Every structure is written in structure tokens, then in C-alpha cells.
Curated annotation (Swiss-Prot):
Amino acids binding substrate: 301-307
GO molecular function, one term: adenylosuccinate synthase activity
Protein source organism: Rhizobium meliloti (strain 1021) (Ensifer meliloti)
Record's keyword terms, sorted: Cytoplasm, GTP-binding, Ligase, Magnesium, Metal-binding, Nucleotide-binding, Purine biosynthesis
Predominant localisation class: cytoplasm
GO CC terms in record: cytoplasm
EC identifiers of the protein: 6.3.4.4
Stated name of the protein: Adenylosuccinate synthetase
Binding site for GTP: 12-18, 40-42, 307, 333-335, 415-417
PROSITE patterns: ADENYLOSUCCIN_SYN_1, ADENYLOSUCCIN_SYN_2
């Protein structure tokens, strides 16, 4: 038995929700370890859809403990709204099934406002990143700047005013420079006071809790958000998120040692998508790109934004396999490729007349790199709902085997529809 870390191996939206749901049924604890409510997914359980952005997937399953680790930035208003929405669907979220790290950073209204102000200014200058405007980046900035308000601060009203003053010294200077009105000390105190009573019962010392449960033999599932190519260090900077999204962050963002992580499962879409700005070597602006978007229902769970679509990029996923130490992948949305006459896979790039096997870190070089493709025959048969290799067309199996060879990692699970049971299990990550 081992613990499992789930990470996205592309630019997010790989289908982590279904796979995490499938795995969470067998886990005892599900841990979020980075990001915020800027990425979401939909779980379908007994025909009921649950849309989650901040809460770990385990929260909708009876008998599971959901944990929000110290690596997550938490908007308390979004947290409570999500809890209330689940309550309306008959799911009770209580301190019995949800624990939140006492040292996790809070996202406040001033973070959301700053995020929006910056994006508006960047849109006018052509330097937009394409954030969700939810305050994630500004909150991480305050965390690194050692001026953040953390969950534990809600319980210490004696020292909170001085911390708010320190926070506002920074933010009001920024706002003056941007031509925006300053924020009053009382406004932030009122905002924090309005959520403290409901948030504090969930607070816990997470590293201690997880260490205790690990020693008892609990199965722990670490649930990543976004994808490797959006990692602040390893992604297509600056068109990235504001946290580390790679598997190593599961340790740092939860307070557990790296030796506790176990099986690293990379969720990998059978083609490539991206939301927002940034380089995308295999992007298709043609009829095939539109086909992938429509067949794959490529719209964001949180923002509703249309996703850009393109061919599978084995060179990028190969990089993700290395950066995460991926043990095996879950290949999703294979069924979306049904009916295409031929399929292309990117195996590298040409840059300045030279062929290279990885995407450089340089923004200018990323923009100039051109994909090098191999072409495979497609298949006309349907793979929708396939639950065994015998249900798959020969060409679909050939495509999967080619992906494995090119990325240097085996397929552990294969998903053939949004339904959780339409999954071909090759290797059980918890038993590896």
C-alpha cells in the first residue's frame, strides 16, 4: 500500500476530477496542497454533479477526511460559499470531514481587487497573463513577503490589528501608485471578523494530523490543481500560475516529507488544451481544433472560458514526467479522438534551424519553436465507455502505446468517457 499524488502533466484541465474521484473512493484522506479556487472540476456521484474549486474531492464522500494544506491560499468567502452550496445538495461539510491548515494564507478582497486592476492594465498594454482575477497571485505575493494574514490569525484578535496595518502599508502604497482609493483598516478587520466564527472550527495543525494518520496506515491521496506546465518554476513563465504545481509541492504544501508521497500519477489528456495566454506549439486554429473543443466540451469549470486545443505534445509531457518523477499516467479523453482520419503527435521542435527534443525556458524561444510531428492512422470505431483493452480498436491501442514510448512512462489508467466507471485499470496506484 502506498500514498498517491495526482498532478496534471499539461496546462491543467486534463480530467483530474474524474480520476481523483475514482481514487478518493479508496483513500482515507484527500489533501489539497497548492493553488486556490482558481481551478475547478466536476464530480458525478450517483448521477449528482458537484462542482468543486477549493474543497478537496473527498469531502463529498462519506467517511473520508478532506484536508486543505498550508500550500493552498484560501478565500474564506469562496470556502464558505462552496460549503453552503454543497449543503444545499445534501452534503454536510463539518470539522469531522474537513480540516484546514492553521498556517494557510487567506485571500482577501484587496487581493481580488488588485488582481483585476493589474489584469485590466495589462490588457491595455498587451501583456495580459490571463488570470482568473480571484486574487491567487497577490495572496501568494503577500505570503512570500511575510505580510500575509493566515488562518490562525483569525483566532488571535490581540495581534491581528498590527498584522492588518502591516498588510495595508504595502497594499495602500500599491493602490496609490495605481490611482486607486486606499483601503481602511476597519474594512479589513470587518471582513476578517465576518468569517472567523465559521472558519476557525475547521482549523488544525495539518502536518501533525497527517503524520499521525500516516503512522496508523491511512491511505492518503494528494490532489493537485492546474498542471505542470503552469508551475511557477517549470511552466511557460510568465504565463503560469503563482504556485508550484509539481509533485514535490505535495510534501511542502502539506507538511509531510517527500518519502511519504509514494506513487506519482500524471493526469494526461490524449490531446492538448490550454486556457488563457501563453505559448502553445501544437495549437490548432482549424476545423480539427474546433472538433476537439466541441467534442471534448472544452470550457473551464470555474471561468467558463473556451480552451485552446491542439495535438498531443509528447515532448512537453516527457518534461512533466521528469519534473514530477511520474510513475505512471492516467490517459484521459481518448474517446474525443474517435473518427479522425489521422492523428499527429509532437515529438520535438525546430528552433533556429536546429531540431530540439524539449521546449526551452526562454519566452522568446518558446514563441519561435515549431512542432515536429509524427502521424498515426486514426480509427472510426467508438471508444466511448470502453472498460477493457479488448473494447478498444487496434489503432487506438497503437496510439496509446506510442504515447507511452514517447513520454517514457506507462499508462496506469485509461479514461474513455466522463463517467467514473468508464476506466480501464492497468496498474492500481495504491497497490504499486
Amino acid at each position: 500500500m502506498t500514498n498517491v499524488v495526482v498532478v496534471g502533466s499539461q496546462w491543467g484541465d486534463e480530467g483530474k476530477g474524474k480520476i481523483v474521484d475514482w481514487l478518493s473512493e479508496r483513500a482515507d484522506i484527500v489533501v489539497r496542497f497548492q493553488g486556490g479556487h482558481n481551478a475547478g472540476h466536476t464530480l458525478v456521484i450517483d448521477g449528482v454533479s458537484y462542482k468543486l474549486s477549493l474543497l478537496p474531492s473527498g469531502v463529498v464522500r462519506p467517511g473520508k477526511l478532506a484536508v486543505i494544506g498550508n500550500g493552498v491560499v484560501i478565500d474564506p468567502h469562496a470556502l464558505l460559499a462552496e460549503i453552503d452550496k454543497l449543503a444545499a445538495q445534501g452534503v454536510k461539510v463539518t470539522p469531522e470531514n474537513l480540516r484546514i491548515a492553521d498556517n494557510a494564507t487567506l485571500i482577501l478582497s484587496l487581493h481580488r481587487e488588485l488582481d483585476g486592476i493589474r489584469e485590466d492594465a495589462a490588457s491595455n498594454s498587451g501583456t495580459k497573463i490571463g488570470t482568473t482575477r480571484r486574487g491567487i497571485g497577490p495572496a501568494y505575493e503577500d505570503k512570500v513577503g511575510r505580510r500575509a494574514i493566515r488562518v490562525m490569525d483569525l483566532a488571535d484578535l490581540d495581534t491581528l490589528p498590527a498584522k492588518v496595518d502591516r498588510l495595508l502599508t504595502h497594499h495602500n502604497a500599491l493602490r496609490r501608485g495605481l490611482g486607486e482609493a486606499e483601503i481602511s483598516h476597519q474594512a479589513i478587520m470587518d471582513e476578517l471578523s465576518s468569517v472567523a466564527e465559521r472558519v476557525l472550527p475547521f482549523m488544525d495543525t495539518i502536518w501533525l494530523l497527517l503524520d499521525r494518520e500516516r503512522r496508523k496506515g491511512a491511505r492518503i491521496l494528494f490532489e493537485g490543481a492546474q498542471g505542470t506546465l503552469l508551475d511557477i518554476d517549470h511552466g511557460t513563465y510568465p504565463f503560469v500560475t503563482s504556485s508550484n504545481t509539481v509533485a514535490g509541492q505535495a510534501a511542502a504544501g502539506s507538511g509531510m516529507g517527500p518519502g511519504s508521497l509514494g506513487y506519482i500519477l500524471g493526469i494526461t489528456k490524449a490531446y492538448t488544451t490550454r486556457v488563457g495566454e501563453g505559448p502553445f506549439p501544437t495549437e490548432l486554429d482549424d476545423e480539427i481544433g474546433r472538433f476537439l473543443g466541441e467534442r471534448g466540451h472544452e470550457f473551464g469549470t470555474v471561468t467558463g472560458r473556451k480552451r485552446r486545443c491542439g495535438w498531443f505534445d509528447a515532448a512537453l509531457v516527457r518534461q512533466s514526467v521528469a519534473a514530477n518523477g511520474i510513475t505512471g499516467i492516467a490517459l484521459t479523453k481518448l474517446d474525443v479522438l474517435d473518427g479522425l482520419d489521422e492523428l499527429k503527435i509532437c515529438v520535438g521542435y525546430t528552433l533556429d534551424g536546429q531540431q530540439i527534443d524539449h521546449l526551452p525556458a526562454s519566452q522568446a524561444q518558446q514563441a519561435s519553436a515549431k512542432p515536429v510531428y509524427i502521424t498515426l492512422e486514426g480509427w472510426k470505431e467508438s471508444t466511448v465507455g470502453a472498460r477493457s483493452w479488448a473494447d478498444l480498436p487496434a489503432q487506438a491501442i497503437k496510439y496509446v502505446r506510442q504515447v507511452e514510448e514517447l513520454i517514457g512512462a506507462p499508462v496506469a489508467l485509461l479514461s474513455t468517457s466522463p463517467e467514473r466507471d468508464d476506466t480501464i485499470l492497468v496498474t492500481d496506484p495504491f497497490e504499486d
